[in-house]
Amino acid sequence: MTAFYKLCGMSMLSLVLADCTFLSANKPYDRDHDGELIVHMKDVNTHKEVGTITISPYIHDGNQEGMLITPHLYNLPANTTHGMHIHINPSCEDNGIAAGGHWDPDNTQKHLGPYNDNGHKGDLPVLVVNADGTATEPVVAPKLNSLEELAGHSLMLHAGGDNYSDKPQPLGGGGARMWCGVIAD
């Protein structure tokens, strides 16, 4: 009888692990045990993955002061900067257009960058790409409070930089949507 229970236990464990593997392979992001969110970034035109961006609480002197955004990206244009934003919708379809506009839960209708509380909450620091086409430099997004509030949105990287203003061009002048990752519920 003991062998029967061991066999049943092993079978159940196999089913659970297989289900977990299936779920993680089909999610656009992963939730780590240490309170991290890993967003898989893809080219909006080719749908080819260019790496991941990890989002985790930024703790300084024992207090949370926003979220730490750590890119692990490759095959990007060398020596460039790119506007980075949280967009409203959890979709990267239609060349990134389905992501909607910048996440603005307070309806400020202002693009003032990541350090001004009077603008879009989805305004993040720019992404800097190294000479070898990788982006690995972490940045802090002080307006973001939790991983949970990011669920149901998307993370977007634009073709150009971001001047954190609506002038001379709206939304920081970042231009076309280039790389996107869904942050699903």
From Swiss-Prot:
Role, per record: Destroys radicals which are normally produced within the cells and which are toxic to biological systems.
EC number: 1.15.1.1
Localization per record: Periplasm
Residues annotated as binding Zn(2+): H102, H111, H120, D123
Keyword match Disulfide bond: yes
UniProt source species: Francisella tularensis subsp. holarctica (strain LVS)
UniProt protein name: Superoxide dismutase [Cu-Zn]
Gene field: sodC
Pfam family name, one: Sod_Cu
Any GO molecular function: superoxide dismutase activity
Oligomeric form and interacting partners: Homodimer.
UniProt keyword terms in alphabetical order: Antioxidant, Copper, Disulfide bond, Metal-binding, Oxidoreductase, Periplasm, Signal, Zinc
Positions that bind Cu cation: H85, H87, H102, H158
PROSITE patterns, alphabetized: SOD_CU_ZN_1, SOD_CU_ZN_2
